[in-house]
From Swiss-Prot:
Predominant place of localization: cytoplasm
Entry protein name: Glutamate 5-kinase
Alphabetical GO biological process terms: L-proline biosynthetic process
Binding-site positions, ATP: K10, T169, D170, T211, G212, G213, M214, G215, T216, K217
Family: Belongs to the glutamate 5-kinase family.
Organism per entry: Klebsiella pneumoniae (strain 342)
Single Gene Ontology MF annotation: ATP binding
CDD domains recorded: AAK_G5K_ProB, PUA_G5K
Enzyme Commission no: 2.7.2.11
Ligand binding (substrate): S50, D137, N149
General function of this protein: Catalyzes the transfer of a phosphate group to glutamate to form L-glutamate 5-phosphate.
Amino acid sequence: MSESQTLVVKLGTSVLTGGSRRLNRAHIVELVRQCAQLHAMGHRIVIVTSGAIAAGREHLGYPELPATIASKQLLAAVGQSRLIQLWEQLFSIYGIHVGQMLLTRADMEDRERFLNARDTLRALLDNSIVPVINENDAVATAEIKVGDNDNLSALAAILAGADKLLLLTDQPGLFTADPRSNPQAELIKDVYGIDDALRAIAGDSVSGLGTGGMGTKLQAADVACRAGIDTIIAAGNRPDVIGHAMEGLPVGTCFHAQESPLENRKRWIFGAPPAGELTVDAGATQAILERGSSLLPKGIKIVSGNFSRGEVIRIRNSEGRDIAHGVSRYNSDALRLIAGQHSQQIDAILGYEYGPVAVHRDDMIIR
């Protein structure tokens, strides 16, 4: 492990709190020690931290608040500053500076903002500063949220050009069944490609404080691995888990990176949270999956959500299965007008056209 590597460490709420209602500072101190040790060896470390709402609730004395988005955002606004203060305080013991990055889905959906976020993150790393990343929960609405820090960590790994992504949780890894209810469940140590069978056995996190269960960790691993980034799911309370993961020692479930990773633009398409979705017919599904064809308006049955031209959208088949993500050539209003129509009719219907396809195959990733 002599060469410098970049590691993204995602710390879930259940890891930071130990399953309690407050931050477990002793455990966070130990996690920082492990990161600082790798930093001193010349490695580049990125932290994706949950816990802002838990920190806010603790700081305010566990107030009785209505179960509303505004209440969560209030707690996040208070807790975010407490959280970054804690990271800064602990890393400063080792003479390490931290830099905070708060992101929303909009930063990932827009290619220019995605590149700006990438440049900022890499500038921090180039100057030996540890980026501390969280979703901007104080302002993010359901429409602009990435949704969970597992998927955010996969996007951060792509932005950072990471070698490895470590998802620390309250479970030792991915099991063949739920270990809490099935004593015969076995730890899956290595995964080479994520399929529907693997997704089916992914259970939910035992913690009620976070938003990400094992299913979202599989989503994150899928995104990272297809971008050429090894991903490990491991228990946050395992001794020296961060250093051992960096060394390549078995610490949980290792999802091995795709041998031929996606090129940079397609990494963005694959990782960006979809702004909307299209449901397509059987003919379009077959053309996309079997021939790698572009999506024509003729094959579109339903347009869901509101999105602009140039945004990433999800493409589903008639059974609701996610078959592809791609960049839309038309906005949602235009697609509703031309859905089910032949491409030759686009100009007559809209009064303009951006070409005959709704999503070009060069701007599409098969899921």
